[in-house]
Regions:
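N-terminal, positively charged nucleic-acid-binding surface of large information/translation enzymes
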Residues: 8-13, 17-105, 458-462
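Short phosphate-binding/catalytic loops that engage adenosine nucleotides
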Residues: 58, 132, 451
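The substrate-binding groove and active-site-proximal loops of carbohydrate-active enzymes
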Residues: 78-84, 108-114, 230
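Structural preference for alpha-helix termini/caps and helix-kink/transition segments
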Residues: 269-270, 277-465
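Alpha-helical recognition segments enriched in aromatics with Gly/Pro capping
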Residues: 1-32, 47, 97, 118-330
Length: 465
């Protein structure tokens, strides 16, 4: 499999340190509110990557954190008159509900930042001892950016350009607490009304960037195979993670980096100020979760993706085609007689090959979806004449590749009441006797009972309305 490595800006063969075992870290949410559809993209994209790696027989150690201490969380708690902890616990539960609704597998480990304070302080000490960090006069601890000659290698930004062109950095000198405006906090001195922990530098709390470094090192080791997140995290978050991790550990932090593109709304950047801000829960309440997952797979993960109501409705309709196809396969396999055509075996093998070729090419989910719908077309064309073995082969391939994409997870088999079965049999008898009036009347009865009947070459097929 080849992936686009942000570090080198090119596609590379994705080779883990240990053959058959991938160690992956994905930046998780800051749980101060419901996640929006932009937050859902990395959640779905990298869950799909994990599923594919596992499908190909690999073991994946997948860590995705919960940021439960942050300026936004503190501010939210102050606005509500509650605590940061209460806010974090409430919205972590809502996040997990959304993640489950989107059919994202649970991480191997899902660490919280507040549970890793000692590990954070261990890295802070390593940085100070090696001269890469210093304690400011107020008790803040800053990373000394100029001590790292490789700083900027992920974002491909030069430190001199950052300092001269970034007003925000210049404004962060904070009364000469920093040696350099580009230096960033790895530990923040306590402020009144904010949560704080004991440290050798006085009461305080961790900086944002060091939380992920500590959780990654604790659960995956000093060098991981892949670090993932949204493009907005490349700088400063991921750049700073690399700097502090590699300076503390003395080795490569992450061998590969993957970043997903932004979500726009009606071709405009999603933002609260433009009133085009949608939470996952907002969209799911109207369309369900599964169309959101399907939508995220319709474009290459590195490309910007434009959210519109028309597109999400189109995804919902496409999912209905998939569900209908699978129901038709189930129906065909329940019949007593089958055809003799074996073509579907060949078409199922072709679909698997096309699917894997697409996924091996930097997680090309649009082409992978195309392979799924090519198989749907063949199933719809050939199921009436296919052998039982060919139908079973097609069903297995269909389930495999839709499962890797995390789709069709709401599939359920409706129990058919005896009354409905009896009416279907009576209707079939009426049709055989060419008693069309009775057949139509029974169809109307079935509709009133909440069932639709479709006449096929294999016989009448029922579906719940």
């Amino acid at each position: 499999m080849q992936i686009f490595n942000t570090l080198t800006r090119q596609k590379e063969e994705f080779v883990p340190q240990v053959p058959g075992e991938y160690r992956i870290y994905v930046c998780g949410p800051t749980v101060y509110n419901y996640i929006h559809i932009g937050n859902a993209r990395p959640l779905i994209v990298f869950d799909t990557l994990r599923r594919y790696l596992e499908y190909r027989g690999n073991k994946v150690f997948y860590v995705s954190n919960i940021t439960d201490i942050d300026d936004k969380l503190i501010k939210k708690g102050q606005e509500e008159g509650t605590s940061m902890k209460e806010v974090a616990q409430r919205f972590e539960a809502e996040y997990l509900k959304d993640a489950a609704g989107l059919n994202c597998k649970k991480p191997t480990v899902q660490p919280r930042a507040t549970e890793h304070i000692q590990q954070i302080l261990d890295i802070v000490k390593d940085l100070i001892d090696s001269g890469h960090a210093y304690v400011a006069k107020n008790g803040d601890v800053y990373f000394r950016v100029k001590s790292d000659p490789e700083y900027g290698k992920l974002s491909h930004l030069k430190l001199d350009d950052l300092e001269s062109g970034n007003r925000e950095l210049r404004s962060q000198m904070d009364d000469d607490l920093k040696e350099d405006p580009a230096d960033f906090a790895v530990w923040k001195a306590a402020k009144p009304g904010e949560p704080a922990w004991e440290s050798p530098y006085g009461m305080g709390r961790p900086g944002w960037h060091i939380e992920c470094s500590a959780m990654s090192r604790t659960h995956l080791g000093k060098t991981i195979d892949l670090h993932c997140g949204g493009q907005d995290l490349i700088f400063p978050h991921h750049e700073n993670e690399i700097a502090q991790s590699e300076c503390a550990n003395g080795c490569t932090f992450a061998r590969y980096w993957m970043h997903n593109g932004f979500i726009n709304v009606d071709n405009q950047k999603m933002s609260k100020s433009l009133h085009n801000f949608f939470t996952v829960r907002d969209v799911a309440d109207v369309y369900g979760y599964e169309p959101i997952r399907s939508f995220m797979l319709t474009a290459g993960y590195r490309m910007p993706l434009n959210y519109t109501v028309d597109l999400i409705e189109s995804c919902k309709n496409s999912l209905e085609r998939l569900y209908t196809c699978r129901e038709n396969l189930d129906f065909a396999l329940t019949k007593d007689t089958f055809g003799t055509d074996e073509t579907l075996k060949e078409k199922a093998a072709e679909a698997r090959t096309k699917f894997c070729t697409a996924m091996d090419d930097d997680l090309n989910t649009p082409d992978a979806l195309a392979a799924v719908f090519d198989l749907v077309k063949e199933i719809n064309t050939l199921s009436a004449v296919s052998s039982k073995d060919a139908l079973q082969t097609a069903a297995a391939a269909f389930d495999e590749i839709t499962g890797v994409l995390g789709l069709l997870y709401n599939r359920k088999k409706d129990e058919v009441p005896a009354e409905v079965t009896e009416l279907v049999e009576k209707r079939a008898a009426a049709k055989k006797a060419k008693d069309w009036a009775t057949a139509d009347a029974i169809r109307a009865q079935l509709t009133e009972l909440g069932w639709a009947v479709k006449d096929t070459a294999q016989g009448p097929q029922l579906s719940k309305l």
